[in-house]
Amino acid sequence: MKYQKTVLAAALLAMATTTQAGGLLTNTNQSIAFNRNFARVGAIGIDGVYFNPAGVAFLDQGFHLSLNFQNVYQTREITSTFSVPALANTPYEYPFKLNGGNTTDGSKFYQGKASVPILPSFQVAYNKDKWSFQAGFGLTGGGGKATFNDGLPSFERSVSLLPALINQQLPTFSALLGQNETPATTYSLQSYMSGQQYNFGLQLGVAYKINENLSVFGGARFNYIYNKYQGSITNISANVGGNNQNLYDYFQSKVNALNEKASALQTQAVAAQTQADALRAQANQTTDPTAKAQLLAAADQYAAGAQKATAGAKLVRAGADKLDSSKEKVKDRYLEVSQRGWGITPILGIDYRTGKWNFAARYEFTTKFNIENNTKRDDTKKYENGVNTPNDIPGILALGAQYEVLKNLRVMAGYNHYFDKDARMDNDKQRFLKHNTQEFLAGVEWDINPSVTVSAGGQRTLYGLGDGKYLTDLSFVTSSYSFGFGAKIKVAKNAHLNVAYFFTNYSNFKKEYDGAIEAGQEQVTQPNGTVTMQPKTLATKNTDIFTRTNKVLGVGLDIDF
């Protein structure tokens, strides 16, 4: 079973904003030409520095430059249902109901927003004779900031049980303090997360035109990773005794009251024992049998009272200590951590053209590297400064073809295969994938006249999510369809303006799973007879429905020198 505690640290480390139109960890939208026609691997153009570097060798002699700027907006949406079978037929069976969940099934909707105001990239090539010297730069992963202002299901599940757990303890509080309080009915918390992830990729390489039909490419991309995460879970509260109360302060007030009562009982015990000792001293000094018996009887009563008060003080003090330990679980928590790492991706390419056809392939090797924590604050004690985490970039095999239907009309198709299962991820998460990511791409391009070209394309992305173990509400993707369209407009003799828009329709992925949440401590008798305290857990039934939205608007300029 999945065991859950407070999850702020895991949430922040796992959360990473992505702007991808590609695999699990890859941005392939590296040019505006791509945004209006996704099947670019089989095409020949300056953006081929990324998509079809071997084909760039077939461009005219001289310098070629492409500048690209994109604006990206995403949402991540989760509908979560959560039940506790042990609390069936009570107000706490569907705990999310106590904080705005659906009144029927307790489901609750969560949304995170991510935006990238400007996502830049460029490609440049210098063709001389049969050689093509190339460079490209872009954010090949991440690229923006994601913000979750209202938390996530994994944040809230453990907190949502607090009213039920508090109500279980109210009789104990009443007995120890002599106070009666009405049961807890609702809960609340304030949570904030922001995450930034950047994979800066600088690609260098050389293509060689073997003949007028065949060219090859060899190069590499230097990847520099920078991630930054900040977050907090604060003001965990519940409506207890008719008032919404911060639980850390509430528990502290009970601890103080219990300690005061324990001290008072101990004072009574000392006073009673002192009186008992004094009466025994008097009894030892008297010779009157009747008086001695009366004094000893009174001393025994005081001594018994002292023992009772001492036992009571011990019991109350134990309750205070237990509650003092419990309050640590609801105190405010903060995390601020950044991560850095780097790796080099070797890249090979080939392009072959014959008649009206052009065929191309690109292979990027899996990039092995780690990212290192730079922790400024970690109240969770989960992310030690200097610890390294696997963060491999999956290899890619990209295949493409283009066919010239007419002089002014071209159709394209492509296939991308991401070797996700070969890329090491944190906690070996890649082992939960059923298969590697696959993409199928198609597009069409039409030259309306020598100055205006329009195009459109589609992409089908299939992730190997299996039964959903790979997914969490902290980091998820779902299979999708993307559609893009746009135009290339000649604005000068040697310059073209590219404009494009694309959007992605994500499928809903339903994940059903069992879980367990810590619900305090319980005494457990070991085989050798010793008694130890162990976490007490409650089994849970969980359903998460994941989906996303993605919209990208871009503009770029291609210049030939």
Describe the role of every protein-language-model region.
Residues 1-7:
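Bacterial N-terminal signal peptides that target proteins for export
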Residues 8-13:
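Hydrophobic helical h-region of N-terminal Sec-dependent signal peptides
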Residues 6, 17-144, 502:
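N-terminal, post-signal peptide beta-strand-biased segments of exported outer-membrane/organellar beta-barrel
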Residues 22-39, 43-44, 119, 127-561:
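Outer-membrane beta-barrel porins/channels
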Residues 14-16, 58, 357, 409:
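Charged, amphipathic alpha-helical interaction segments
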Residues 14-19, 450:
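Short hydrophobic alpha-helical membrane-anchoring segments
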